[in-house]
């Protein structure tokens, strides 16, 4: 797809570097003379002090791609302003997806939670540098719409099956079911139109069950874990953030990270900077040494000492599996993003050295379609909570848990926000054109996939 609505396709990497150099956006600027490190303003869109300038760079990307203003829709100023406010979250989602998908930028600092100056700091990847050669241009030019299953596409990193002997919970983890999530992603308007990412290369017969497609690990590292230089960065793989991870000590956020690998392991070690493994990707519990409450510090440290050799998460087929290897008990549940309503699954103990499925993506998408069709009263839950050392069913508020890990699959969050935006737009007939252009076809495809798998009621 070379053009969108008559607008020549723009390569995100080149476009962003030009915007950083332009000096037209407050807070978007280079941080060194070599122009290899820059900052992007990143205010949370739920804040009350949000204004138009906070979404300026995200809107600019939508305009550059011909996604805004909507073609064929002329609204008076008050309605146009309201429509723009509704679209801001989508602009930010698309910008974030494109930023992660190019493979050209490495997140160095996430200061988005700063109450005064929320921003993120990125560095140009040393493997690619600041220039763009023909190969890189071709990679950014390819659309995910060219990577449909008819080309023999494999599940790739999202659907890795490295350990073939692992027991699966149901026959749905066949090759057809394994392709469900990938196909849904490929039909996504967000990914197809905005990411500028690559198709997964076809595999030779017989490789489907064993191939694990490596991601550029350094591009997903956080400050708590030093970034090793990848030996062979696989820049042709879609670099979508698999999980947003938040670690809290008794309600206090101590780490926010993005896991972009199909396997990760939660570890604790005072010597965390010495960790150099990238398979599975490590997520290191921060030291509780700075906690002001000495009693809390003592018990938190005691629990963390028994996490080793770790808690492993792995994406296998359409399910997320957990394996607890340490002595510290871990309880899990799936609930609402803020944990304010009852969980959709009762809190359960993760048995030690036993693979346990804790989330099913195909179930989420089926429930999401039911929610969209108004056959379901509430939106499906996708936030996974892991309580270390304390039973989540004890009735205490989650912010009282000594060690709590919150996992949010990025793709679930993006799809739910898209459906919610669609629902808002559909209440006003004059703004129907503002809906995501391919939402209907997307959900028709999801319906077909679910019916083919025998999952449709």
UniProtKB/Swiss-Prot annotation:
Alphabetical UniProt keywords: Acetylation, Activator, Cytoplasm, DNA-binding, Immunity, Innate immunity, Isopeptide bond, Nucleus, Phosphoprotein, Transcription, Transcription regulation, Ubl conjugation
In the record, the effect of residue 438 to D is given as: Increased transcriptional activation
What GO CC terms are in its UniProt record? chromatin; cytosol; nucleoplasm
Tell what triggers its expression. Answer: Induced by lipopolysaccharide (LPS). Induced by type I interferon (IFN) and viruses (HIV-1 and SeV viruses).
The residues joined by the cross-link Glycyl lysine isopeptide (Lys-Gly) (interchain with G-Cter in ubiquitin) are 329
* DNA-binding region positions on the chain: 9-126
Q: Which residues carry this modification: Phosphoserine?
A: 425-426, 429, 431, 437-438, 441
Q: Name one GO biological process term.
A: positive regulation of type I interferon-mediated signaling pathway
Activity regulation description: In the absence of viral infection, maintained as a monomer in an autoinhibited state and phosphorylation disrupts this autoinhibition leading to the liberation of the DNA-binding and dimerization activities and its nuclear localization where it can activate type I IFN and ISG genes.
Major localization class: nucleus
Where is the cross-link described as Glycyl lysine isopeptide (Lys-Gly) (interchain with G-Cter in SUMO)?
398, 400
Which residues carry the post-translational modification N6-acetyllysine, per the record? 92
Q: Where in the cell is it found?
A: Nucleus; Cytoplasm
Q: Which domain of life is it from?
A: Eukaryota
What does UniProt say on post-translational modification here? Acetylation inhibits its DNA-binding ability and activity. In response to a viral infection, phosphorylated by TBK1 and IKBKE1. Phosphorylation, and subsequent activation is inhibited by vaccinia virus protein E3. In TLR7- and TLR9-mediated signaling pathway, phosphorylated by IRAK1.
The entry's stated outcome for residue 426 to D is:
Strongly decreased transcriptional activation in response to viral infection
Concerning Gene3D superfamilies, the annotation shows: 2.60.200.10, Winged helix-like DNA-binding domain superfamily/Winged helix DNA-binding domain
Q: Give the molecular function GO annotations.
A: cis-regulatory region sequence-specific DNA binding; DNA binding; DNA-binding transcription factor activity, RNA polymerase II-specific; RNA polymerase II cis-regulatory region sequence-specific DNA binding
- Pfam families linked: IRF, IRF-3
Region described as Necessary for the interaction with NMI = 238-410
Q: Does the keyword Transcription regulation apply?
A: yes
What biological function has been recorded for the protein in this entry? Key transcriptional regulator of type I interferon (IFN)-dependent immune responses and plays a critical role in the innate immune response against DNA and RNA viruses. Regulates the transcription of type I IFN genes (IFN-alpha and IFN-beta) and IFN-stimulated genes (ISG) by binding to an interferon-stimulated response element (ISRE) in their promoters. Can efficiently activate both the IFN-beta (IFNB) and the IFN-alpha (IFNA) genes and mediate their induction via both the virus-activated, MyD88-independent pathway and the TLR-activated, MyD88-dependent pathway.
Subunit details: Monomer. Homodimer; phosphorylation-induced. Heterodimer with IRF3. Interacts with TICAM1 and TICAM2. Interacts with MYD88 and TRAF6. Interacts with NMI; the interaction is direct and leads to the inhibition of IRF7-mediated type I IFN production. Interacts with GBP4; preventing interaction between TRAF6 and IRF7, resulting in impaired TRAF6-mediated IRF7 ubiquitination. Interacts with TARBP2; this interaction prevents IRF7 phosphorylation and activation.
Q: Which family does it belong to?
A: Belongs to the IRF family.
Name of the protein described by the UniProt record: Interferon regulatory factor 7
Q: What gene is behind this protein?
A: Irf7
């Amino acid at each position: 797809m070379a053009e969108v609505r008559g607008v020549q396709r723009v390569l995100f990497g080149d476009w962003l570097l030009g915007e950083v150099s332009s000096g037209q956006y407050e807070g978007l600027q280079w941080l060194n003379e070599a122009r290899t490190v820059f900052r992007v303003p990143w205010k949370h869109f739920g804040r009350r002090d949000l204004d138009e300038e906070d979404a300026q760079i995200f809107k600019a990307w939508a305009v550059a791609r011909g996604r805004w203003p909507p073609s064929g829709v002329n609204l008076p100023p008050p309605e146009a302003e309201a429509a723009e406010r509704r679209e801001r979250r989508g602009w930010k989602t698309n910008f974030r997806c494109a930023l992660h998908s190019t493979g050209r930028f490495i997140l160095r600092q996430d200061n988005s939670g700063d109450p005064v100056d929320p921003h993120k700091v990125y560095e140009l990847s040393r493997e690619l540098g600041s220039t763009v050669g023909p190969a890189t241009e071709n990679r950014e030019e390819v659309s995910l719409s060219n990577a449909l299953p008819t080309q023999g596409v494999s599940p790739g990193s999202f659907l890795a099956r490295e350990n073939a002997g692992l027991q699966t919970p149901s026959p749905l983890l066949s090759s057809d079911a394994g392709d469900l999530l990938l196909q849904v992603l490929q039909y996504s308007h967000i990914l197809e139109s905005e990411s500028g990412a690559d198709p997964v290369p076809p595999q030779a017969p017989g490789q489907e069950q064993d191939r694990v497609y490596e991601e550029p690990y350094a591009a997903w590292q956080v400050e708590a874990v030093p970034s090793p230089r990848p030996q062979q960065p696989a820049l042709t793989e879609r670099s979508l953030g698999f999980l947003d991870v938040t670690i809290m000590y008794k309600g206090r956020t101590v780490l926010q990270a993005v896991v972009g690998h199909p396997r990760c392991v939660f570890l604790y070690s005072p010597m965390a900077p010495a960790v150099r493994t990238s398979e599975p990707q490590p997520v290191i519990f921060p030291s509780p040494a700075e906690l002001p409450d000495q009693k809390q510090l003592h018990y938190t440290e005691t629990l963390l000492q028994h996490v080793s050799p770790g808690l492993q998460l792995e994406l296998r087929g359409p399910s997320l599996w957990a394996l607890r290897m340490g002595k510290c008990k871990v309880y899990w549940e799936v609930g609402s993003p803020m944990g304010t309503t009852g969980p959709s699954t009762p809190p359960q103990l993760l048995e030690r050295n036993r693979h346990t499925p804790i989330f099913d993506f195909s179930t989420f998408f089926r429930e999401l379609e039911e929610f969209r069709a108004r056959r379901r009263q509430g939106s499906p839950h996708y936030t996974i909570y892991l309580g270390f050392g304390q039973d989540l069913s004890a009735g205490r508020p989650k912010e009282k848990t000594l060690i709590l890990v919150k996992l949010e699959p990025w793709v679930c969050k993006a799809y739910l926000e898209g459906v919610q935006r669609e629902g808002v737009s559909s209440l006003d007939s004059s703004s129907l054109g503002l809906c995501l252009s391919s939402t209907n076809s997307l959900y028709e495809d999801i319906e077909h996939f679910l019916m083919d798998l025998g999952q449709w009621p």
